[in-house]
């Protein structure tokens, strides 16, 4: 069996929603979670500057850890440069996290779907290509929130969420027109599932919320060699790397719940 680790990458701790699902399918693998929290949030970065930063980080990561596969657990990075990563590192398997627009278009009954994302994901050409390819017959509302990813990070650090502000961020997702209304909202940021119970509480009406984490987990498992013997005991511990030194006690507790040992202040030579 290939004993190389599976690497997860995000700007913060939102990608833990994806790690949780992948780990449930292949618990025997070693997982390395990388959070470039110095760069958080990625949604407001200038594109070329962010691309250069990510490429430098991955040049370092892949040299040091030689993973079997990398999960880009960040919609902003995936929609911006998954093709660039595959081209630069052709020997590495990459699984991206992109808006589940195809699935939403297949499941909507009203034809009205919304994509709740970051500003970066909303403006990406990749996102609009997904809509044109799979949801051309649908009314697709793109909503780029500048605040929700930060709300999720703060919530996971034990801080309270301003529900009125959260409600204002999701209100544009709820569209009524010609007797029809939104029936599906795509969560297009890996941070957002951590806020899902708040979204449901503040929703204007009942909708289906699509979290792509399970689909990403299945895709990841399909790309890795299947174990011959049903090994479930890890040989190596999982761990997390953070680029900042500022890891709060609540974040440490969260990572402990995910059985991740922490190394902070990692310098990726960016």
From Swiss-Prot:
Catalytic reaction list: L-glutamate = D-glutamate
EC numbers on record: 5.1.1.3
Residues bound to substrate: 10-11, 42-43, 75-76, 190-191
Active-site positions on this chain: 74 (proton donor/acceptor), 189 (proton donor/acceptor)
UniProt keyword Isomerase, yes or no: yes
Enzyme class, UniProt record, top EC level: isomerase
Pfam family, one: Asp_Glu_race
Presence of the UniProt keyword Isomerase in the record: yes
Pathway entry: Cell wall biogenesis; peptidoglycan biosynthesis
GO MF terms, alphabetically ordered: glutamate racemase activity
Keywords: Cell shape, Cell wall biogenesis/degradation, Isomerase, Peptidoglycan synthesis
Source organism superkingdom: Bacteria
UniProt-listed GO biological process terms: cell wall organization; peptidoglycan biosynthetic process; regulation of cell shape
Family: Belongs to the aspartate/glutamate racemases family.
Its job: Provides the (R)-glutamate required for cell wall biosynthesis.
NCBIfam families in the record: glut_race (TIGR00067)
Database matches in HAMAP family: Glu_racemase (MF_00258)
Identification of the protein by name: Glutamate racemase
Organism: Bartonella henselae (strain ATCC 49882 / DSM 28221 / CCUG 30454 / Houston 1) (Rochalimaea henselae)
Gene expressing this chain: murI
């Amino acid at each position: 069996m290939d004993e190389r680790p599976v690497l997860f990458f995000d700007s913060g701790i939102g990608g833990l929603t994806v790690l949780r699902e992948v780990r449930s399918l292949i618990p025997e693998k070693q997982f390395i979670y990388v959070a470039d929290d110095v760069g958080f949030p990625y949604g407001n970065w200038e594109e070329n500057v962010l691309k250069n930063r990510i490429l430098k980080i991955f040049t370092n990561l892949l040299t040091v850890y030689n993973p079997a596969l990398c999960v880009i657990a960040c919609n902003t990075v995936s929609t911006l440069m998954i093709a660039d990563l595959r081209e630069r590192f052709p020997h590495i398997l990459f699984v991206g996290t992109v808006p589940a627009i195809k699935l939403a278009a297949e499941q909507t009954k009203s034809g009205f779907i919304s994509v709740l994302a970051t500003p970066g994901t909303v403006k990406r050409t990749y996102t609009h290509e997904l809509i044109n390819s799979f949801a051309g017959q649908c009314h697709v509302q793109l909503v780029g929130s500048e605040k929700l990813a930060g709300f999720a990070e703060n919530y996971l650090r034990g801080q309270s969420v301003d529900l009125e502000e959260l409600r204002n961020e999701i209100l544009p997702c709820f569209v009524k027109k010609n007797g029809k209304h939104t029936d599906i909202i795509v969560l297009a940021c890996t941070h957002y599932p951590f806020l899902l119970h708040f979204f449901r509480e503040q929703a204007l009406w009942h909708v289906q919320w699509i979290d792509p984490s399970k689909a990403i987990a299945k895709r990841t498992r399909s790309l890795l060699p299947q174990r011959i013997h049903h090994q479930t005991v890890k040989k190596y511990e999982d761990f997390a790397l953070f680029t900042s030194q500022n890891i709060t006690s609540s974040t440490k507790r969260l990572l402990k719940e995910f059985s991740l040992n922490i190394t902070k202040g990692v310098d990726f030579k960016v």
